[in-house]
Amino acid sequence: MLSLRQSIRFFKPATRTLCSSRYLLQQKPVVKTAQNLAEVNGPETLIGPGAKEGTVPTDLDQETGLARLELLGKLEGIDVFDTKPLDSSRKGTMKDPIIIESYDDYRYVGCTGSPAGSHTIMWLKPTVNEVARCWECGSVYKLNPVGVPNDDHHH
């Protein structure tokens, strides 16, 4: 039995040293770093190129991810996270709600009443299917989806 163990231990499966599929799998795809919002095409394009040797990096050189997306937007004068305050000049009603735009199927909204600051912030969550009504002042918020429709395609 000892000789059988030793022969199994020395058995090595044959490997192909030159294989085109192995070469293709080891190749890294070339990804261009986005220099403006129009060039953003997924998270891999939101990685900064880094500073050239011997120079001090700028924010544009080293920002990555959402911080880079926000910086590219600010350079073009676009608020990518839509942080402007909601319309508080009126109360939303069921017939005429305050419209909230969102790229997702829900959004968190902080209601402070009408006029603004009438009550403490009440956090609401309007969805695509339901409006949200403030418990304090009764103002109604409705979601307007502006994003790409979900095709429910799973990999």
Curated annotation (Swiss-Prot):
Zn(2+) binds at C111, H119, C134, C137. The modification Phosphothreonine is found at T55. GO terms for molecular function: oxidoreductase activity; zinc ion binding. It is a peripheral membrane protein. It is found in: Mitochondrion inner membrane. Pathway: Energy metabolism; oxidative phosphorylation. InterPro entries: Cyt_c_oxidase_su5b, Cyt_c_oxidase_su5b_sf. PROSITE patterns: COX5B_1, COX5B_2. PANTHER family: CYTOCHROME C OXIDASE SUBUNIT 5B, ISOFORM A-RELATED (PTHR10122:SF0), CYTOCHROME C OXIDASE SUBUNIT 5B, MITOCHONDRIAL (PTHR10122). Component of the cytochrome c oxidase (complex IV, CIV), a multisubunit enzyme composed of 12 subunits. The complex is composed of a catalytic core of 3 subunits COX1, COX2 and COX3, encoded in the mitochondrial DNA, and 9 supernumerary subunits COX4, COX5A (or COX5B), COX6, COX7, COX8, COX9, COX12, COX13 and COX26, which are encoded in the nuclear genome. This is Cytochrome c oxidase subunit 4, mitochondrial.
